[in-house]
């Protein structure tokens, strides 16, 4: 490893640690007294086997996640897959704190956890997870692509009726697709972990910001797409900037 790479890796670690240390997750109030995923989370969990790692997601990984997710949200908003058109579909943005929470989650080496994920900025972010295993592991980019494809294929079982009523927290094996196309989600951040236990394993996890959870529909229908948008996104014509204010 060159000195430049060593410096970049050390700098990335310092930045991640500074984000984590900026907030004392142990003092946050969590429902039902649950432990917070970021509280005293200095190392890897008991399920992690040998040589656990959390590879850094670089700009090319972040760009790919946002491009594919926002493409999907856009075509759904336009009425693809026989779904109703969406009156408003925010274009997702990347959030570093959500990504940090996702990275902390993956350090447990489990796909799902009941641990609290609330922060001072976000109340109970949603979560989507994917796990892969084998004699070898593909590249980080391939793992991310496999995860997004796995979540996307849940569309084959997600119906128009589900679009109209899919209560928050419900999981019929379709939660990941429902999360990806929800108009209540405005930001995303993801993390990746790899370890060896019998064989090689990888876990990809995304935390998602829900701006509200009272409405049971995945998104609000419209006579046409973007009818509740003041101005559509320059790249995704069926989407709207995530910070545009509106009333439900």
Swiss-Prot record:
One of its GO terms (molecular function) is toxin activity. A motif (Cell attachment site) lies at residues 221-223. Expressed in salivary glands. It holds the Pfam family CAP. It is found in: Secreted. Belongs to the CRISP family. Inhibits platelet aggregation induced by all agonists tested (ADP, arachidonic acid, the thromboxane A2 analog U46619, thrombin, and snake venom snaclecs (TMVA that activates platelet through GPIB, and stejnulxin that specifically acts through GPVI (GP6))). May act by competing with fibrinogen for binding to glycoprotein IIb/IIIa (ITGA2B/ITGB3). This is Tabinhibitin 10. It comes from Tabanus yao (Horsefly).
